[in-house]
UniProtKB/Swiss-Prot annotation:
Coiled coil: none annotated. The keyword Transferase applies. It comes from Pseudothermotoga lettingae (strain ATCC BAA-301 / DSM 14385 / NBRC 107922 / TMO). The record marks K27, K236 as: Transition state stabilizer. One of its GO terms (molecular function) is ATP binding. The lineage of its organism: Bacteria, Thermotogati, Thermotogota, Thermotogae, Thermotogales. GO terms for biological process: arginine biosynthetic process via ornithine; L-arginine biosynthetic process. This is Acetylglutamate kinase. InterPro entries: AceGlu_kinase-like_sf, AcgluKinase_fam, ArgB, Asp/Glu/Uridylate_kinase, NAGK-C. The keyword Transport does not apply. Keywords: Amino-acid biosynthesis, Arginine biosynthesis, ATP-binding, Cytoplasm, Kinase, Nucleotide-binding, Transferase. It is found in: Cytoplasm. Pathway: Amino-acid biosynthesis; L-arginine biosynthesis; N(2)-acetyl-L-ornithine from L-glutamate: step 2/4.
Length: 279
């Protein structure tokens, strides 16, 4: 083993010790799970985290698959500021697609030695919502009012890896689609997680084609104002800022198409994506 490899090994061991018994909320987007190799790499990375006594909680999206099915059905997908406009038909499609993705992720993790369990935001009052009107009326899109963190903590105590589908409910029983980035951030805040990690299909936060390895809250907001951050990255950065202001120590954006990018980002000094901190 070379001296360089030894140095990396010591880095990994140091971080493993630091993060033992800590909670990581990992949001994985549908686009990052398009390829079989990416699915396998992600599942193995999550199982590794559990083996080194980190508590991973997965929140998954499904935007790519939802859009694909809508197009196949002749329904035009609409977005506003990165958020999906969700009428009743779109909500039905979203729930169906998200349920399938949830089962696929659970199966993949379990096949690689994990103990994952799939849950919906409607299970045990996990995600109580109200209609989100921050971007105008965009239909059945929910703003989370309360997270039943005790439910998740019970699952962790039983050595489960929770895989959460971002669908919630209102006090009147109305079902709401929740942006998965928002759901992940709110769950991380509720659990006082150590890290919030976005596994996407881009290297991280980009400017002029170059990766930005480190960002603080002030500069993250500036990138949104300047239009550098746009589309689906807007909710991620907004959620990252909210999480950091609420006490989450760091937020990361990594490319799930790179094998084990999640572990490289967490367990090495320089990482592979973008790390955001408050200052």
């Amino acid at each position: 083993m070379t001296s360089e490899n030894m140095a990396i090994l010591f880095e990994v061991l140091q971080y493993m010790k630091e993060f033992r018994e800590k909670t990581f909320v990992v949001k994985v987007g549908g686009a990052a799970l398009e390829k079989e190799e990416a699915k396998t790499s992600f599942a193995k990375s999550i199982v590794f985290l559990r083996h080194v006594q980190v508590n991973p909680i997965i929140v998954h999206g499904g935007g790519v698959e939802i859009t694909r099915l809508m197009n196949q059905l002749g329904i035009k997908p609409l977005f506003k500021n990165g958020y999906r406009v969700t009428d009743e038909k779109t909500l039905q499609i979203a729930e169906m697609v998200l349920e399938k993705i949830n089962k696929d992720i659970v199966l993949k993790i379990n096949l690689h030695g994990g103990r994952a369990i799939g849950v919906s935001g409607k299970d045990d009052n996990l995600l109580l919502c109200e209609k989100d009107i921050a971007n105008g009326d965009i239909g059945y899109v929910g703003k989370i009012r309360k997270v039943n963190s005790g439910f998740i903590e019970k699952l962790i105590a039983q050595n489960y890896i929770p895989v959460i589908c971002p669908v919630g409910f209102g006090e009147d029983g109305t079902t709401y689609n929740i942006n998965a980035d928002v759901a992940a951030a709110e769950i991380a805040i509720s659990l006082k997680a150590e890290k919030l990690i976005f596994v996407s299909d881009v290297p991280g936060v980009m400017k002029d084609g170059e990766l930005i390895p480190y960002l603080d809250v002030r500069n993250a907001r500036k990138l949104i104002e300047e239009g550098v951050v746009k589309g689906g990255m807007i909710p991620k950065i907004q959620c990252a800022v909210n999480a950091l202001k609420a006490g989450i120590k760091s937020v990361h954006v990594v490319n799930g198409e790179i094998p084990h990018a999640l572990l490289t980002e967490i367990f090495t000094l320089h990482g592979i994506g973008t790390m955001l901190r408050e200052i």
